[in-house]
Swiss-Prot record:
This is Ribulose bisphosphate carboxylase large chain. Mg(2+) binds at K201, D203, E204. SUPFAM superfamilies: RuBisCo, C-terminal domain, RuBisCO, large subunit, small (N-terminal) domain. HAMAP family: RuBisCO_L_type1. Keywords: Acetylation, Calvin cycle, Carbon dioxide fixation, Chloroplast, Disulfide bond, Lyase, Magnesium, Metal-binding, Methylation, Monooxygenase, Oxidoreductase, Photorespiration, Photosynthesis, Plastid. The modification N-acetylproline is found at P3. The active site is at K175 (proton acceptor), H294 (proton acceptor). The record marks K334 as: Transition state stabilizer. The modification N6-carboxylysine is found at K201. RuBisCO catalyzes two reactions: the carboxylation of D-ribulose 1,5-bisphosphate, the primary event in carbon dioxide fixation, as well as the oxidative fragmentation of the pentose substrate in the photorespiration process. Both reactions occur simultaneously and in competition at the same active site. It comes from Gerbera jamesonii (Transvaal daisy). The keyword Disulfide bond applies. The disulfide bond which can form in the large chain dimeric partners within the hexadecamer appears to be associated with oxidative stress and protein turnover. It holds the Pfam family RuBisCO_large_N.
Amino acid sequence: MSPQTETKASVGFKAGVKDYKLTYYTPDYETKDTDILAAFRVTPQPGVPPEEAGAAVAAESSTGTWTTVWTDGLTSLDRYKGRCYGIEPVPGEESQFIAYVAYPLDLFEEGSVTNMFTSIVGKVFGFKALRALRLEDLRIPIAYVKTFQGPRHGIQVERDKLNKYGRPLLGCTIKPKLGLSAKNYGRAVYECLRGGLDFTKDDENVNSQPFMRWRDRFLFCTEALFKAQTETGEIKGHYLNATAGTCEEMMKRAVFARELGVPIIMHDYLTGGFTANTTLAHYCRDNGLLLHIHRAMHAVIDRQKNHGMHFRVLAKALRMSGGDHIHSGTVVGKLEGEREITLGFVDLLRDDFIEKDRSRGIYFTQDWVSLPGVLPVASGGIHVWHMPALTEIFGDDSVLQFGGGTLGHPWGNAPGAVANRVALEACVQARNEGRDLAREGNEIIREAAKWSPELAAACEVWKAIKFEFNPVDTLDX
């Protein structure tokens, strides 16, 4: 063997398998301001100590592998390794604990949500020593936040662009989501916008199917939008879904939307992927488009309490990747969402600085510095009777989106839009007068219905509709 390639055990390398905790469990470590911090809910296999399981998570999501390797000696593991620096029991769960892991910032490519997730959650979730693993929260350091452009301009700039202030924005998802021709689809858009809504929306799976190709939909919806805008004197928008099978096709649709002069487009950011989403967000910023984000597929990732990734992490990632709106659940509608948890990640979307608050599921203080905020979108199984609660829960900086709650009105789409607009204006006025929306909500709606026949008809149709199921994802006791 050539002297240049000969290796000897005497240089300090010792082959074999080492316990992860010997290298990656460091309870005395003091976290740095530049570290990315993660909170994992860990369910180890029977017989695996918490310290070993937590260290395994830190190792397998950073520099570690299952055995000692020669090339460990060619770099500084102390500089680059992830560290499990804390273990915390989960109340009422003997087999679970929270493991806190710190990652050096140099492990991650600047401005890449894709790379961040590939490292932190890319492989370790299939590790055999763990029965289940869930990423509960991330602390993104300021140094890393500043490598992202985030949402196009933020909430205030969107309000200025739309000239709408002092209330939540109103939207509607066109139904049925699949099967309409482009012309009939555009007709429904026009009726809803004419009736008083600010936005209408493509559903998440409306892309370019045989019954309605994307270009036809874009043209008819744009015609509807400008016609309603002319008649009402209000700026209107329709979320034209640019999601496609390739990034090139997605960008072609975005370019066409810009050429049509519409104010906003849409993307399914989880099924489309973070690389595609960030690419589209950069284009929207450069070309004056707002970007609405749908979270289709999120529940596959975030709904189970023991395994996956909490939506608050996906929400933070979206704010970094870029998007002006994102669906966030409703608390009161048909979709999963416990109140305090939902309010926690809504604040993470909108506010500049959010304190650690375990009562709302927030594990770390997060400083977004100058990264613009995102409007949360409440959508899914909501109707006029929910308006007081939605206004009280989400406040003005939100989009309240009624699909069936608009198009299901017995008199048609435009009266359905009128009913929602009247209900919203009544709730905002009552709140501004000092009334308690949580306690007096039904009374406020009944009073408004006396002078709005459209609202009265909507109240009658949906008076008995409730979705009374307990959420799966709840706060720990």
